[in-house]
Amino acid sequence: MHPSQAVAAPLGNATHHQEMTDHGKKQLTPHNQHRISGGFGIEETVPNQRNGRLTRQQNPRLLRTLLNAASRPAECEANAVRKIVRLVARTGCRTHILHVSSGLSVDVLRQAKAEGLPVSAETCPHYLTLDCDHIPDNATEFKCCPPIRDLREQDALWAGLADGTLDGVVTDHSPASADMKAGTLATAWGGVSSLQVGFRAVLTGAMRRGLSLADVVRWMSCNTARLVGLDDRGDITPVLRADLAIIRPYERFVVDATALESRNPICACDGMTLNGVVTRTFVAGRDALSGVREGNLIVRP
């Protein structure tokens, strides 16, 4: 998070978060009031009616049952967002909601923004491009929290991006070794490795819905840079830092997890056909690939 008094925490005791947001409100200044003062990951669980806890033995191979219906249904996520929005309304604290995965949460955020509350929110590539009904049993590479939900929820997330309710898309890149992903969905490490393919996965989904490359760049670069105060980058504009990728948006490729740069060849997009072949990458104006001859400046911008 940006150093302008940003905090991050899971949803827990409401009194604790009231104290946190009060603290953040006190530290706002004219310089940083448009940036994040509080950041919250949204997560609540449903207790098992029999013993007050969700048992690990309850359908440990089915992602839909174990992570969606049994422990983290969309209603719980939306309830968590409602609690945060109420605190924002009471304190005026600039707040960012992480990892939105459900349409119910989008509805809450849409209303909050309509009321002028200082709240922003993001979702992730896996919530936009994968759905729980097409995930094989015990495929632990898809395990994450909040969980990957169904197509109805996915459509609602895209609608939230299109109308500006959701401000951006972030990778939430969380790689893991084969040992960490071993076992069942109940025991395996939760996290999706998406850094190298996340942008292309979102681009593919956007193009299928009639959205553009410019939309994806706005969600995954421009808006995110502004959100955390990286004012010197994030857009293609004179005087900004030249962090650029040269991409062929209509050229397609098949994801091969073993060919990715990650140390661990585990990827939820393995085998998917995606749009967007990257041909060159520049970091601060320099070609990121070693041994590539640099060009000369011909015309001053």
Predicted regions and their residues:
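Histidine/acidic residue-rich metal-binding segments in metalloenzymes
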Residues: 1, 35, 39-41, 47-169
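Short, strongly patterned local motifs
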Residues: 1-24, 28-31, 36-54
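Ser/Thr-centric signal marking residues that sit
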Residues: 123, 171, 221, 279-281
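Glycine/Thr-rich phosphate-binding loops of Rossmann-like dinucleotide-binding domains
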Residues: 106, 129, 177-179, 254-255, ...
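Short, glycine-/Ser/Thr-/acidic-enriched flexible segments
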Residues: 102, 126, 174-176, 251-252, ...
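Detector for intrinsically disordered, low-structure N-terminal pre-sequences
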Residues: 6, 45, 215, 297-298
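C-terminal cap of metal-dependent C-N hydrolases
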Residues: 184-187, 238-299
